[in-house]
């Protein structure tokens, strides 16, 4: 078994203009402080304040947005990281694992990965993702790319339709169609950080947000050894070369994960489970008393000193004891959060340490808080109650359906840009307005300059005389539209849809 040396993982170099030479502990920490500044000051982080956590288009500032949720995840991630480092220090293993001079970067990478973990999410969360993927599937039919004979291919885009006698090109068409129809927030986060925002973060910092290791163009079953790590797309074809370089720099085997990503994932799991329930009470979906009864009955068999009694029961009793001086709601969630963290954070930290050989290798094929333990059961309890009583609430479902319609409608509106021929779209990009295409010209003008420049940069590097050119040009045109719409906030997408559908009041 290879030795564990985090100096080989916490790579402080960057893709562009990387610092050179051997660095002192302080100099390395300054490099990661620069990462923090780049991330915290990025527009993508600011936009999280108007993106959905659970309740779309929420006006109540006490209810969480993606930004406030991410800040809470950041704090829990820091807590877990410190707990891990503290335990390793007690065991005199910091130096053995190459962490004695890297505790600051270790914590910083985890914190910033937590803050960025939702950076690529589209408006309206998972329903926004579903709307994008459904819309493109209805036009590209990636499942038909496997069909024989080729005449069964229902793809409406001629350059992406399979052709007889073009097997090499057909392979690229299959990849492109599969990739475009698998938009995913985590993969979009990688694209945002590297391609769109050009943040030029350290290799280690980007490794921290590569949560899933399956390429978006993957077809067929995934290997059992990586079934959990590859359960969702983690990056797109457009970032394939960058991810290949990232793997080399971080010494990651194919489809393996960066070690600190497990901490970010655990912090997210701990944070949102309690937060979703608190937001539901704030929204008056149920009362604290009703929530307690939901949790009590969902737990099943009760024993005096069970984990449920130590965490949930304790919070309930303490909150009822202080009803005269403080809000029961505030008290209950304060104690519930504290009790949950005090149990789950040490457990997550110990799981990280106990499984460090596999985690360091990037092959640990499960989450830190998904096992047969009571701690995992407690987390599952929170999730199940939220699914049964929060996400299925009529008000929540109505807003989700509205969000799905908004994103689908925006894609319908911008569809004329995808219908233009290669030559017509190329001319529109060069001249920005064409009299013979008044609608397309106005739609093109509305696209973000950042997204248009990203399209121009990558397409200008493609050899125009290559047989692949029409296929790849259309791929990046689809990415352009997905980049623009997925980058909107909930409120902007809602307003833009109403304006362009001429239903603005």
From Swiss-Prot:
GO terms for molecular function: dGTPase activity; magnesium ion binding. It catalyses: dGTP + H2O = 2'-deoxyguanosine + triphosphate + H(+). Its EC number is 3.1.5.1. This is Deoxyguanosinetriphosphate triphosphohydrolase. The gene is dgt. GO terms for biological process: dGTP catabolic process. InterPro entries: dGTP_triP_hydro_central_sf, dGTPase, dGTPase-like, dNTPase_1, HD/PDEase_dom, HD_domain. NCBIfam families: dGTP_triPase, PRK04926.1. Signal peptide: none annotated. It is an enzyme of class 3 (hydrolase). SUPFAM superfamilies: HD-domain/PDEase-like. dGTPase preferentially hydrolyzes dGTP over the other canonical NTPs. The keyword Transcription regulation does not apply. Belongs to the dGTPase family. Type 1 subfamily. Keywords: Hydrolase, Magnesium. It comes from Salmonella enteritidis PT4 (strain P125109). PANTHER family: DEOXYGUANOSINETRIPHOSPHATE TRIPHOSPHOHYDROLASE, DEOXYNUCLEOSIDE TRIPHOSPHATE TRIPHOSPHOHYDROLASE.
């Amino acid at each position: 078994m290879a030795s564990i040396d985090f100096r080989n993982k916490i790579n402080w170099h960057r893709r562009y203009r990387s610092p050179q030479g051997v660095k002192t502990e302080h100099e390395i920490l300054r490099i990661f402080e620069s990462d923090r500044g780049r991330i915290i000051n990025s527009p993508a982080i600011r936009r999280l304040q108007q993106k959905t956590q659970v309740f779309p288009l929420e006006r109540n500032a006490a209810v969480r947005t993606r930004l406030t949720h991410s800040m809470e995840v950041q704090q829990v991630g820091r807590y877990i990281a410190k707990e891990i480092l503290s335990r390793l220090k007690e065991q005199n293993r910091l130096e053995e694992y190459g962490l004695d001079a890297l505790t600051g970067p270790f914590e910083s990478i985890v914190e910033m990965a937590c803050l960025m973990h939702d950076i690529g999410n589209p408006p309206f969360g998972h329903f926004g993702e579903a709307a994008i993927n459904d819309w493109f599937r209805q036009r590209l039919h990636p499942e038909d790319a496997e069909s024989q004979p080729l005449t069964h291919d229902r793809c409406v885009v001629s350059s992406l339709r399979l052709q007889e006698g073009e097997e090499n090109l057909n392979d690229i068409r299959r990849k492109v169609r599969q990739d475009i129809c698998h938009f995913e927030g985590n993969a979009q986060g990688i694209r945002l950080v590297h391609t769109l925002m050009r943040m030029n973060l350290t290799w280690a910092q980007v490794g921290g947000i590569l949560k899933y290791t399956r390429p978006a163009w993957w077809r067929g079953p995934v290997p059992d050894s990586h079934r959990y790590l590859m359960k969702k797309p983690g990056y797109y074809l457009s970032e394939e070369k960058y991810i290949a370089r990232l793997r080399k720099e971080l010494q990651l085997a194919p489809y393996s994960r960066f070690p600190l990503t497990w901490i970010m994932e655990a912090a997210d799991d701990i944070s949102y489970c309690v937060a979703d329930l608190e937001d539901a009470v704030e929204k008056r979906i149920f009362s604290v008393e009703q929530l307690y009864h939901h949790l009590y009955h969902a737990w099943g068999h009760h024993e005096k000193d069970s984990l449920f009694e130590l965490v949930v029961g304790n919070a309930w009793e303490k909150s009822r004891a202080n009803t005269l001086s403080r809000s029961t709601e505030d008290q209950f969630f304060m104690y519930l959060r504290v009790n949950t963290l005090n149990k789950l954070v040490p457990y997550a930290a110990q799981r990280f340490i106990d499984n460090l050989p596999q985690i360091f290798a990037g092959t640990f094929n499960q989450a830190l808080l998904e096992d047969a333990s009571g701690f995992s059961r407690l987390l599952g309890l929170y999730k199940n109650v939220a699914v049964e009583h929060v996400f299925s609430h009529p008000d929540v479902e109505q807003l989700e359906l509205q969000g799905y319609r908004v994103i689908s409608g925006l894609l319908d509106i911008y569809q004329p840009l995808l219908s233009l021929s290669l030559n017509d779209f190329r001319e529109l990009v060069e001249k920005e307005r064409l009299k013979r295409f008044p609608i397309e010209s106005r739609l093109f003008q509305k696209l973000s300059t950042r997204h248009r420049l990203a399209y121009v940069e990558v397409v200008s590097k493609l050899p125009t005389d290559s047989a692949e050119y029409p296929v790849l040009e259309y791929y990046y045109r689809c990415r352009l539209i997905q980049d623009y719409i997925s980058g909107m906030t909930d409120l902007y997408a809602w307003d833009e849809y109403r304006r362009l559908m001429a239903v603005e009041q």
